[in-house]
């Protein structure tokens, strides 16, 4: 199963268990360093706007490529946010989008936020943290171990 399938299955499982105005929070298990303040911020922004995605401003230069060998244009990073989990959604909104995607056989969306955008919804940003790293490669473990030695209050300010 893909990440899309896992989240969709969870959303569909909750059909008779949640009220439409309840919220769900989605987080990647491969992102184990998550300060409580980051979760609180996602919840706060979601309650204000119906959804929220943990996000940070993009600082490194970004270049668009069509072949992964060379760059064809740079991307204005002043208008780019890096999003990650946790993400929170009003349950009725998530359910509506996953039901549409299921009917249209669209399963390419890794994040629910991408699905919302596809169906014309605005996604709101909650202040994230660079310490919320995704551990997918062996070298990520060294960074993870180093981050474990930093007090939580210094990981999110």
Description of each model-found segment:
Residues 1-20:
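Short phosphate-binding loop-to-helix
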Residues 1-2, 29-32, 130-131:
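Short glycine-rich anion-binding loops that position phosphate/pyrophosphate groups of nucleotides
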Residues 7-8, 36-39, 138:
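Conserved strand-to-helix beginnings and helix N-cap segments that scaffold or border functional pockets
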Residues 10, 28, 57, 90, ...:
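Residue-level signal for inorganic ion chemistry
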Residues 12, 16, 44, 118, ...:
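Short, well-ordered alpha-helices that flank and scaffold nucleotide-derived cofactor binding pockets
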Residues 18-30:
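Short beta-strand-to-loop acidic/aromatic patch adjacent to the donor-nucleotide binding site
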Residues 33-126, 157:
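Conserved core of the sugar-phosphate nucleotidyltransferase
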Residues 132-157:
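Hydrophobic helical membrane-anchoring modules
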